Amino acid sequence: MLYVEPQAGPAPILQVIQQAHRSVDLNVYYLSSRPVIHALAHAVGRGVRVRVILDEHPYGMKPWQIRKEADAVQAIGGRLHWAPTRFEAAPGRYVFDHAKYVCNGHECEIGTANFDWTAFHRNREYLDLTRNPGVVHAAMQVFQADWTGQGAGSTPHRILVLSPGSDAKILAVIDQHGPVDIESEEMGNDRAILDALAAKGRSARVILPASISAQDRRNVAWLKSRGVQVRLLPKHPLYMHAKMITGKDEAFVGSENFSEASLDRNREMGLLLHGGAIGKLQEQFNRDWARAGET
């Protein structure tokens, strides 16, 4: 089931944790939500094994903030691993564990939201809650691989939209027949994505936050010269943090931004959605489009 933030709040994540019988495996770019941490603490108290993977060097966060995240997990009795080295930033290396998901063995939440107050109260985000056995197994396989520092293998790449290596699936969503609507925090610098959007022309509509970078503004100007419709959503009262693409046949929701690093180097996770989720995404997009301003 698809959930929209900030309407849903932390409830979809809490559901996964509260319904865990044996284990909770959580991987998120950053974790500071008190309701989520409290739910994890209660899970530990019920005898549930709680494992958490966090990015040790998230962009823009201070060391004390990262230490606070780690201390919170360890204080409740959870087991903490930092992301594998290949998904951690270093001098001259712009790469992150940017995934955002939680699984309990029979159910997973996968989406665009970090687990913090802002995501659940001030951001546009999308979360998908699924009991699809193939998706659950694939996500847990990725978690176990990252927990042990191994490769995830081919099966998760077939079932999920998984980075590194998610560009082909995202391009296929953009290239589907008919119009496409996109919400994203960044326009990004991936040439193939930009060219695919340009090829859509007026059949593509894009909503970005009004705070996009100068480089994003140049890319937006280029896309508009090819006919792409772009609007900017003011940062307040609601910030556009989502990463969503929807057409009439298929949709994407996940952690991936449209940058080469996000698609080809980071750890990212998303899903391809069909059926009723598409209508829900299109309805929310149309409401956001009406609120956004012309560039």
Q: Which residue stretches match the model-derived regions?
A:
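Amphipathic alpha-helical interface segments
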Residues: 273-295
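HKD-type phospholipase D/PLD-like phosphodiesterase module
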Residues: 1-21, 27-175, 186, 191, ...
